[in-house]
From Swiss-Prot:
Biased amino acid composition, Acidic residues: 553-564
Protein name per the record: Major facilitator superfamily multidrug transporter mdrA
Keyword entries, A-Z: Cell membrane, Membrane, Transmembrane, Transmembrane helix, Transport
Family listed: Belongs to the major facilitator superfamily. DHA1 family. Polyamines/proton antiporter (TC 2.A.1.2.16) subfamily.
Amino acid composition bias (Low complexity), ranges on this chain: 572-583
Species of origin: Aspergillus fumigatus (strain ATCC MYA-4609 / CBS 101355 / FGSC A1100 / Af293) (Neosartorya fumigata)
GO biological process annotation, one example: transmembrane transport
Role played: MFS transporter involved in the basal level of azole susceptibility. Confers resistance to voriconazole and, to a lesser extent, to fluconazole.
Single Gene Ontology MF annotation: transmembrane transporter activity
Coiled-coil boundaries: none
Keyword Methyltransferase: no
Bilayer disposition of the protein: Multi-pass membrane protein
Localization: Cell membrane
Length: 607
């Protein structure tokens, strides 16, 4: 009787399970099952002592890596718009600053806090939302935080005093930091390392286009309808993006998806299923996740010269961009006497430069692919830097050009065109340095990116606060030259790391540990049994490429790196391709936006 009842229940489950997964089901059901998923021969016996190990099936419809290119690029564009919206919200506020000053009877330095504290909120992103997304998934964190961003934007429109407005702006920035932090992770979840370069190049334009478009939209809207309409528009725009992303963007984070699948399989079958990733890595508590996320970025920032110098360079450039939101109105409204809306149009010059940079980065990706092939899949991190060499020179050229052509006697187009080399250089510097840091710190990449983001956000928050005073005391020419001199002082950094990067990395503790990890991975792959036939699939681990040095000359730092798991376990999680090439290509699978707590577990313990 019990057997018949069990068979009936199993039959009902089978009938209720979709054989193909419709897209809406991917969005609303992270652990969606099909009969094929249930019948898959998972390793194990389904007991507490020997649970079934849940892994992706071949061509698994729920695995983001196997989705169609159309779906991947559609989602890439969607998350890019979500980051563009946040960046636009950060700067569009400047379009209503004059009206805010007049209504609340405050000075420009207090009104500017609406921008500064919003950007300061960005520093919270990698410290708070990144570990939460690794615990609960990217989808739920995005949905909740973007809803809060929309609410705080809408609340700003009804603020009755300046401090209410400023505090609401801070919370909007803090919650808006979530898509800025997690959107790159969504792209890394879907694209293999070789495909990720172009996707990230196109995606990277969004966080820069937003701040440039913001003053233009805010300027005209503030001039014609008032600052409350600016805030109202930002609330409506972010709300529309929130609705679109909530409806169309599914969960993409593999550890969470496999965990949900294991939970649902256990519930449906009565057997014990556990995600293979959780078995290999272990479940991380929320306390441990925050401990790592809050401490490790600071250790890397202040102990690693590579991280500190390149993060400082990016922070100066980022701060300069936000400084221009106060500088352009001074130059074009105060000196050239343009109205509030028209004086925001010069930001289009920066946007043109950004578009050229994105085009150039797509073209340069072909060069990088060739270098990667030449090194057998282990292109050195320094191969990422050639575009940065050009860009580092373009930035001070654009800034000095702007500083000394903003005389009223010189035609306005000359001054506006100065924004093009600055925008061109800014995007390429950011892309080149971010990729270099990821490649040089593979297993520490998430923490390095967090350190970079925090320092960058602090500079972006501080620079606008002293801009007005600087222009009043120094005049428009010398004040505009200050960031140009700072950028000029940073020009040697990319050249230094391009020429001596390999040597410097050996002398940096955590860069050396990362390199030692990659050597061990390469060595274990060499020692692994060769495929029995030519058609056997071999793995390509998704990582950012790093050099494959002579493994016979392993530094002492290797002793601090934990033994890699058995290479056959890695194969079970790796993406595969046919072994048709003559040279083995090995890549680290880790997502650069995820904190590696397995291979770095002992790296930050006190000695």
């Amino acid at each position: 009787m019990a057997t018949e009842k069990g068979d009936q229940n199993a039959e009902k489950i089978e009938q209720s399970l979709p054989q193909k997964i419709p897209y809406w089901r991917l969005v609303v059901d992270q652990g969606v099952l099909t009969q094929q998923i249930i019948d898959y021969p998972y390793k194990g016996s389904g007991t507490e002592e020997d649970p079934y190990e849940v892994v992706w099936m071949e061509n698994d419809p729920r695995n983001p890596m196997t989705w169609t290119q159309l779906r991947k690029w559609s989602l890439t564009m969607t998350v890019a718009v979500s980051t563009l919206a946040v960046a636009l919200v950060s700067s569009a506020y400047t379009g209503g600053v004059r009206e805010i000053e007049a209504e609340f009877h405050i000075g420009s330095e207090v009104a500017t806090l609406g921008v500064s504290l919003f950007v300061l909120g960005f520093a919270i992103g990698p410290l708070l939302w990144a570990p939460l997304s690794e615990m609960f998934g990217r989808q739920i964190i995005f949905t909740v935080t973007y809803c809060a961003l929309t609410a705080f934007n809408a609340g700003s429109a009804g603020a009755q005093n300046s401090w209410t407005l400023i505090i609401l702006r801070f919370f909007a920035g803090a919650f808006g930091a979530s898509p800025l932090t997690n959107a790159g992770g969504v792209i890394a979840d879907m694209f293999h390392a070789k495909q990720r370069g172009i996707a990230m190049s196109l995606f990277a334009a969004a966080p820069f286009l937003g701040p440039v478009l913001g003053p233009i939209i805010g300027g005209f809207l503030g001039m014609n309808a008032g600052w409350r309409w600016v805030m109202g528009f930002l609330g409506a725009f972010s709300g529309a993006v929130w609705i679109i992303c909530t409806i169309f963007v599914p969960e993409t984070y593999a550890p969470v998806l496999l965990r949900r699948r294991a939970e649902k399989l256990s519930k449906h079958t009565g057997k014990v299923y556990v995600s293979k990733i959780d078995i290999d890595q272990g479940r991380v508590t929320l306390k441990d996740a925050f401990k790592t996320a809050l401490s490790r970025p600071w250790i890397l920032l202040f102990k690693e010269p590579i991280v500190f110098l390149l993060s400082l360079y990016m922070a100066i450039i980022y701060g300069t961009l936000y400084m221009l939101f106060s500088a352009y109105p001074i130059v074009f409204q105060g000196v050239r006497h343009w109205n509030q809306g028209v004086s925001s149009l010069p930001f289009l010059g920066i946007m043109v430069g950004m578009m050229f940079a994105v085009t150039y980065s797509v073209w340069d990706n072909k060069r990088y692919v060739q270098v990667q092939a030449k090194h057998g899949g282990f292109a050195p991190p320094e191969a990422r830097l050639p575009p940065t060499l050009i860009a580092s020179v373009a930035i001070p050229i654009g800034l000095f050009w702007f500083a000394w052509t903003n005389y009223p006697s010189i035609h306005w187009i000359v001054c506006i065109l100065a924004g093009a080399p600055f925008g061109f250089g800014m995007v390429l510097v950011f892309l080149g340095i971010m990729n270099y840091l990821i490649d040089a710190y593979t297993i520490f990449a998430a923490s390095v990116l967090a350190a970079n983001s925090v320092l960058r956000s602090i500079f972006g928050a501080v620079f606008p606060l002293f801009t007005t005073y600087m222009y009043e005391d120094l005049g428009i020419h010398w004040a505009s030259s200050i960031p140009a001199f700072l950028a000029l002082a940073c020009v040697p950094f990319p050249f230094l790391f391009y020429k001596y990067g390999a040597t410097i990395r050996k002398r940096c503790e955590y860069a050396a540990k990362s390199d030692a990890f990659m050597r061990k991975l390469a060595e274990q792959m060499k020692q692994a049994p060769e495929p029995e036939s030519e058609e056997t699939e071999e793995p390509v681990f998704d990582r950012t490429e790093a050099p494959a040095p002579d493994v016979s000359d392993v530094s002492e730092t290797e002793s601090n790196v934990e033994e890699l798991p058995d290479v056959r376990q890695m194969r079970s999680r790796a993406s595969t391709r046919t072994a048709s090439s003559l040279r083995r290509v090995v890549s680290y699978e880790g997502n650069p936006y995820d904190i590696d707590r397995v291979n770095t577990r002992e790296s930050f313990t006190k000695k």
